[in-house]
């Protein structure tokens, strides 16, 4: 029997290996809202969490129980009470909260413990640990309203949690915590997850929502937000009356977490099978990241970037789109190059060759990785190169191109005669390539 070759599997594995190495030994806090737990895809999410654990990632799983609590209250004819969009947990409600949270804890523990069954890792034991790792305190009274048993975190025993993580356990934490006086309090899962991520110096905080992430006005996924942008989105959603959706709750926590040192917070869909793995083990992910520092950077190239630039431009050189450059030439001209990097991979580059006497510059060797050509990376490079040219006192910018004539025309370049090139460039013009000359005023 001839076995079918799975090229996609091979390529996917090659791309994921660097992330496996990067994530090993790091601490991730995963926030599972009650909506995610109710969904049919939850068993797949649990399996993927088990897979992360098997790869050596230290995991703290925080679960919420909002819809389960509401259902339990309704079943006992107990009307939920809210003040300023926060649940008021009276004595009767607290018992129903504890009941819902306790059942979820047992269910999630059982699922995580057997999450690697029916996989090649069957037989590997996963130890799931819960405990009194958080101390709660009451929210108190606000505008004359007593929140009763609704509380907030007073402190976290991060040393005890780290000991469990060091021992290879998954730490599972729910929405009920006790105070120093032994009283129980109902906490929000987003507050628990956020404070845990900060205290444990987690690499990532991950949350789930019904959509694939944060969407723009056209319904497309926004792949990356800075905290101020995420905060603006929270305020926008709240203005529309959305105070407690999974997206809003997670974004509130993500803003605080990022500003307190958590490098990346990820919001993904609980409805999409494999979204957790796609987000963590691919270059572009599948959801929305909230980050203090972008995964993508534009900067001047250094000698260490030569390998990445060569890998990017070689296919274009072989197709005749770019003029071939040797490694030696690239080493001598590396200070002319600007690159865009994403997760340490060079995805775009361009060079600026100034002709100072003529006050004109050439933008050359413009290349964008095929996966990113539908985005705005080319425009970002053009803006950066134009800014560099202005700083040098140059007044015009020209390009020689055989394939991208319309792209440059759409961005203010106009075709000109070869005679308008600087004298030294004119002498080097390759009449066999017959490249078109386009020029723009830098203004």
From Swiss-Prot:
GO terms for biological process: L-arginine biosynthetic process. Its EC number is 2.3.1.1. It catalyses: L-glutamate + acetyl-CoA = N-acetyl-L-glutamate + CoA + H(+). The keyword Amino-acid biosynthesis applies. It comes from the Bacteria. Its main location: cytoplasm. PROSITE patterns: GNAT. Gene3D superfamilies: 3.40.630.30, Acetylglutamate kinase-like. It is found in: Cytoplasm. SUPFAM superfamilies: Acyl-CoA N-acyltransferases (Nat), Carbamate kinase-like. Residues 296-443 form the N-acetyltransferase domain. Keywords: Acyltransferase, Amino-acid biosynthesis, Arginine biosynthesis, Cytoplasm, Transferase. GO terms for molecular function: L-glutamate N-acetyltransferase activity. Pathway: Amino-acid biosynthesis; L-arginine biosynthesis; N(2)-acetyl-L-ornithine from L-glutamate: step 1/4. One of its GO terms (cellular component) is cytoplasm. It is an enzyme of class 2 (transferase). Homohexamer. Belongs to the acetyltransferase family. ArgA subfamily. This is Amino-acid acetyltransferase. It comes from Salmonella typhimurium (strain LT2 / SGSC1412 / ATCC 700720). The lineage of its organism: Bacteria, Pseudomonadati, Pseudomonadota, Gammaproteobacteria, Enterobacterales. The gene is argA.
């Amino acid at each position: 029997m001839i076995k079918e070759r799975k090229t996609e599997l091979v390529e996917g594995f090659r791309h994921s290996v660097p992330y496996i190495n990067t994530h090993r030994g790091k601490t991730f806090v995963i926030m599972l809202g009650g909506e995610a737990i109710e969904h049919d895809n939850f068993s797949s999410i649990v399996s993927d969490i088990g897979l992360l654990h098997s790869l050596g990632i230290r995991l703290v799983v925080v679960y919420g129980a909002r819809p389960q609590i509401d259902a339990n209250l309704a079943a006992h004819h107990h009307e939920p009470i809210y003040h300023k969009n926060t649940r008021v947990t009276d004595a009767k409600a607290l018992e129903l909260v504890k009941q819902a949270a306790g059942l979820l804890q047992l269910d999630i523990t059982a699922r995580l413990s057997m999450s690697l069954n029916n996989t090649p890792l069957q037989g590997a034991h996963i130890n799931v640990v819960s405990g009194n790792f958080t101390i709660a305190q009451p929210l108190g009274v606000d505008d004359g309203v007593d929140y009763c048993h609704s509380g907030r975190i007073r402190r976290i025993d991060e040393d005890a949690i780290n000991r469990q993580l060091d021992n290879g356990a998954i730490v599972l934490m729910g929405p009920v915590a006790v105070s120093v006086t032994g009283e129980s309090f109902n906490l929000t899962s987003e507050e628990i997850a956020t404070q845990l991520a900060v205290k444990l110096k987690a690499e990532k905080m991950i949350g789930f929502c019904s959509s694939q992430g944060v969407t723009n006005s056209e319904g497309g996924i926004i792949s990356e937000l800075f905290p101020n942008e995420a905060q603006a989105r929270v305020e926008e959603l709240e203005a529309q009356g959305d105070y407690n959706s999974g997206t809003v709750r997670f974004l509130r926590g993500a803003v605080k977490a990022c500003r307190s040192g958590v490098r990346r917070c990820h919001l993904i869909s609980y409805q999409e099978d494999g979204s957790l793995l796609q987000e963590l083990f691919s270059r572009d992910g599948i959801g929305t990241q909230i980050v203090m520092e972008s995964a993508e950077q534009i900067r001047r190239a250094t000698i260490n970037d030569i390998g990445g630039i060569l890998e990017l431009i070689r296919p274009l050189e072989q197709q005749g789109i770019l003029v071939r450059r040797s490694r030696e030439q690239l080493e001598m001209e590396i200070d002319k190059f600007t690159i865009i990097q994403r997760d340490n991979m060079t995805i775009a580059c361009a060079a600026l060759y100034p002709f100072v006497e003529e006050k004109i510059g050439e933008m050359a060797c413009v290349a964008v990785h095929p996966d990113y050509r539908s985005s705005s990376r080319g425009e970002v490079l053009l803006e950066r190169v134009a800014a560099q040219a202005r700083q040098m006192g140059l007044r015009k910018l020209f390009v020689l191109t055989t394939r991208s004539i319309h792209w440059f025309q759409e961005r203010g370049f106009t075709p000109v005669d070869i005679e308008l090139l600087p004298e030294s460039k004119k002498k080097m013009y390759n009449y066999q390539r017959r490249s078109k000359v386009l020029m723009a005023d830098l203004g």
